[in-house]
Amino acid sequence: MNYSIDIASNTKNVNYGASRLQLKRFDVSKMVDHATIAMIAKRGSGKSWVCRNIMYEKKDIATCTVVSPTEKLNSFYGNFIPPAYIYNRYDSDILSRIYSRQERMFEDNKKREEKGKKPKDDRILLIMDDCMSSKGKWLKDDQILELFFNGRHHHVSFILTMQFSL
């Protein structure tokens, strides 16, 4: 495998045998609001670090909730996310509370706009990092399906990281 980098176009050409793949640098600052992102990569490949980079670029989002079974072992998110917003395992109640919050924010903002006031920022970022150990619990959960299909309408940005595909 060999590669070449074109600095002017921000692309990297990767040759693998007879195949050629052109990769373009992803600019996180241009990512749309309320995105749904799934990262699938092997252990130790930097998925959590990519999440951290996205969090940094989206630091203007006031609320972030993290579900990470490994957090109790490595405190990766604990250095910059308050403990009240970090969960060690998935529970559908987490999403219920997020949806309730978003509904309250929506109603409050509607009232604020009627009064001519500026709406509050209702965006939220949810990260489910390496939650494959509890996939039986969340994979068929209606709350997760709602998030995948309608998260953007709830103003929820969602990042799911996994070591292998479902």
Segments (PLM) and residue ranges:
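Detector for small/aliphatic-rich hydrophobic stretches
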Residues: 1, 5-9
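Intrinsically disordered, low-complexity eukaryotic regions enriched in glycine, serine
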Residues: 6, 13, 30, 67, ...
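Pre-Walker A adenine-sensing motif
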Residues: 11-31, 52
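Conserved P-loop NTPase motor cores
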Residues: 24-25, 34-62, 69-73, 89-166
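A domain-level signal for caspase-like cysteine endopeptidase catalytic cores
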Residues: 65, 76-77
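Active-site regions of enzymes building and remodeling cell-envelope glycoconjugates
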Residues: 77-92
